[in-house]
Amino acid sequence: DDCIVVEYYIVTDSAFTKRFKSNSALTNYVTVMFTGVQNLMDTLELGIGVRLLGVTTFTEKTEPSFIKDNLIPGPPAAFDPDVLISAMSKYYCNHQTGLAKDTDLIFLITARGMGDPREDGTVDINTAGIANSAGVCKPCFKSGIATDDSDYNERVDTLAHESVHLLGSPHDGEGPNLVSLEGSPGAANCPAKAGYIMGNRNDKNKYKFSPCTKKCVEYLLSKPTASCIFQQCRD
């Protein structure tokens, strides 16, 4: 029997990396994060497991071009999310080796903000994360980004929220036209104000996914495009 396991490769920007005394402290922090992501994924009731394959911690010296070249100096230094996700997707499309090749999803965790660039060279910080719709398993589209300002719950929510975009769900209240997968049911029947993770997140429902999100993810799982997340069950 097959098990559904979504494998993640995490890369961190220099601003996030330097918050930690050591690489092992950073890796422990990210590992704890995935316990939280698993708990949220469990609310889909689709038997989806998450697995962290590895972490690459970039420093100012080793940051790849997609990070360095797109940093808006500010102050504070920040990114335009659309520009960054596009550059990151292209970068990993052209660098399919090692964990980047083997993984189902690649996430950048950044300690810098994201938002809309203003004319004066600063950025209106308004975006916690961004990801490619239904991009799981597709080498050129399996990227996502989560900002981390060190509030544990917010961080886990963002990672789970962006993961589910990659697994084929739009925001609650959005139709199938916003999913990059033909035939998707979309989520127009679940209003954002119901407060789920893909909606406006109220106290009652902010730690679970809506019935529409479940249907969208279930639909993606039924398609050949999701083949990489099915694997033989471990004992």
UniProtKB/Swiss-Prot annotation:
A GO CC term attached to the entry: extracellular region
Instruction: Please name the top-level EC class of this enzyme.
Output: hydrolase
Molecular function via GO: metal ion binding; metalloendopeptidase activity; toxin activity
Give every Peptidase M12B domain span: 4-233
Q: Where in the cell is it found?
A: Secreted
Keywords attached to this Swiss-Prot or TrEMBL record, sorted alphabetically, are: Calcium, Disulfide bond, Hydrolase, Metal-binding, Metalloprotease, Protease, Secreted, Toxin, Zinc
Q: Please report any disulfide bonds recorded for this protein chain, giving both cysteine positions.
A: 137-228
How is the co-factor bound, per the entry? Binds 1 zinc ion per subunit.
Q: In which tissues is it expressed?
A: Expressed by the venom gland.
Output one GO BP term.
membrane protein ectodomain proteolysis
Q: Which cofactor does it need?
A: Zn(2+)
* Location of the active site: 162
PANTHER family this protein is in?
ADAM A DISINTEGRIN AND METALLOPROTEASE DOMAIN (PTHR11905), ADAM METALLOPROTEASE (PTHR11905:SF159)
- Please identify the protein, giving its name as recorded: Venom metalloproteinase antarease-like TserMP_B
Q: Which organism is it from?
A: Tityus serrulatus (Brazilian scorpion)
